[in-house]
């Protein structure tokens, strides 16, 4: 049977009979560069994407620090203003659901969403600490499905690793290898194959297994095969 949603968490909620007419699935449309945080008095929400990419930023030492990429295989709890924000790296759309509703309907989805986000944050930290910036850039650009995307230098998903000069050198290395082309201040992917060879693989390997981490929705589905 064809899935209704690309995001496995939304599909799970839908499969459990929670159609959009039964509670306020708030539809979202966003464009690159927009940012949001939750007002202190607002109802906590989980955001699930159907397209686009967000980056989660947390506040450390009074500065916003990027800590995780959020795509269509993941959900994120919208942080309070005092904790950080989410920012759109690509145009997209999705749905916002009250946390309390998700918890009451399917606590497994809430648990798996939290666990997936922790894994994503751990991968981000490991990647930025252990891999060279050209590898990091290639991996994140590949994860974000960039075949027809043109980046500006200030929107590249480099995660604050190094300096702007280091980012320029990393882009030049990708260009010399034939992965990207720099023209008019924009960075265009010209070879996904070269980009894949240069990428460290941290985020792309995580994305391949993310959908499988969601637990079955009913006790019968969780029973081992006879």
Please identify what each model-predicted range represents.
Residues 35-41, 57-59, 78-79, 126-129, ...:
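Short histidine-centered beta-strand/loop micro-motifs
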Residues 27-28, 37-39, 44-50, 67-68, ...:
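His/acidic/aromatic-lined binding-pocket segments of jelly-roll/cupin-type domains
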Residues 107-164:
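Polybasic "coupling" helices that flank or enter modular domains
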Residues 63-119, 123:
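Cyclic-nucleotide recognition modules
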Residues 1-32, 73-75:
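Cyclic nucleotide-binding regulatory module and flanking cytosolic helices
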């Amino acid at each position: 049977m064809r899935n209704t949603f690309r995001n496995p968490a939304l599909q799970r909620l839908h499969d459990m009979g929670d159609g959009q007419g039964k509670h306020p699935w708030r539809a979202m449309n966003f464009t690159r560069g927009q940012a949001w945080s939750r007002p202190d008095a607002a109802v906590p929400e989980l955001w699930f994407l159907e397209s686009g990419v967000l980056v989660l930023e947390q506040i450390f030492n009074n500065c916003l620090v990027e800590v995780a990429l959020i795509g269509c295989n993941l959900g994120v709890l919208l942080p309070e203003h005092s904790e950080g924000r989410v920012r759109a790296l690509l145009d997209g759309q999705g749905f916002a659901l009250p946390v309390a509703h998700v918890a009451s309907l399917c606590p497994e989805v809430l648990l798996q969403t939290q666990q997936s986000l922790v894994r994503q944050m751990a991968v981000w930290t490991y990647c930025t600490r252990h891999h060279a910036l050209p590898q990091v850039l290639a991996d994140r650009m590949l994860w974000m499905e960039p075949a027809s995307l043109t980046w500006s230098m200030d929107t590249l998903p480099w995660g604050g690793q190094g300096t702007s000069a280091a980012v320029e050198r990393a882009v030049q290395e990708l260009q010399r290898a034939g992965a990207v082309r720099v023209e008019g201040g924009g960075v265009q992917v010209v070879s996904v194959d070269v980009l894949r060879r240069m990428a460290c693989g941290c985020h792309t390997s995580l994305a391949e297994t993310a959908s499988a981490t969601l637990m079955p929705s009913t006790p019968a589905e969780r029973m081992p095969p006879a």
